[in-house]
Amino acid sequence: MFQNRFFRRAAALVLTLALAAAAALPGLAAYPMPIQTASETEAVYLFNADTGKTILAQNADQQQYVASLTKMMTALLLLESGKDLNGEVTVPTAMTQEFKDIQNANGMTAGLRIGETVRRIDLLYALLVSSANDAASVIAYDVGGSVLDFVRQMNARAAELGCTGTNFTCAHGLFDYGNVSTAEDMARIAAECYKNPTFVQVSGTAAYTMPATNLHQNERTINSTNPLTDTGSEFYRSYIKCVKGGFTTLAGRCAVAFAEQGGHTYGLVILHADNASLYTECDQLLDWAFESFSDRPLVDTQTELTTVDLTKCRAQPTALYAAAPVSGYGHADDVVSYAFDLPESIPATVKNGQKVGTATVYLDGYEVGTVDLVTHAEYISDFRTDSKATLLLLCTLVVILGALTVLTLAAGGGSLNLRRRKRRH
């Protein structure tokens, strides 16, 4: 009995340590890459956005130039600033040199002009839909008071999110030198952005019409630079909800995408990709994720999960079963494990279906849920059984003794009558 308890405790301790170790390694990829990327230096990070679980990782912790993916942090700080998105901003003269630098670098713009008054929501659409660098700089000035102070805010926010390989030097990513991050860090930033419904709506827009302003008499239609949200593109996927792309000569092609299907969400980051292969790889990796992971039964109510010792009962230990089935979402190769919360032993009598403890169910180290553990049989205490047997034996002996007494008395009475008859004769 002692050995059984010892081994169960040891197994529970090992499982707890293993789960803690798994939780401490968020960058550990659980699955091999299903495709060959166009470049060995390409960085890939695919994760389950619902749980944070890493699915695929290739060069995910290596610093890369991130080009316009920088604009995700710019958008996040605007959305977190509390400023009225329908409020207007006037482009300051302080943007004069900034706009010249953007023009000299052949950066994408929304055609903003010094002195132009534009709504913040229009700046946000220009930033995320057409990847306008001038919009990023105006947002930086509006939120931070200056571009330099805004960049400081960007780096501080990245550190708060747990980014360790990120350094921003501008609000748009057009100027590469020193503006670096990792695929894993960009996933952290993107996941925070994805929590904001406005970010999801804006970044998932294929085309947007900016209204006329004081310096633009006509409306301006801006189009997405990313074909993943273009219904007419060969790369279009209906499950993709929002996306941000980027490109510079040093950064190569970059993309962040979020995809939802069947109640499950994945986030994907690709850095330093080939121009011809980026969107094909995005589709292939997200298609693979939805095809390879599914909801499946993990625990039924008829399979023994563990046992518990009984006291005052010779029939021990007793098997324990899940009180209800448990299902989970994962890969076919994912291993199911348990952490039990049980007493060392329980006293008999035990009823059929009696709750004894609980089991926390894990799939590939990630918690799925907790279920009650119950018995599937009835056990009666040996003390009660022995007491009943003793009482029955005593009753039987009393009856037998009583019967013998009656017989003895009856036999004695017959002999007395016989002697009386003989005396009369």
How should each PLM-predicted stretch be described?
Residues 15-23:
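Hydrophobic core
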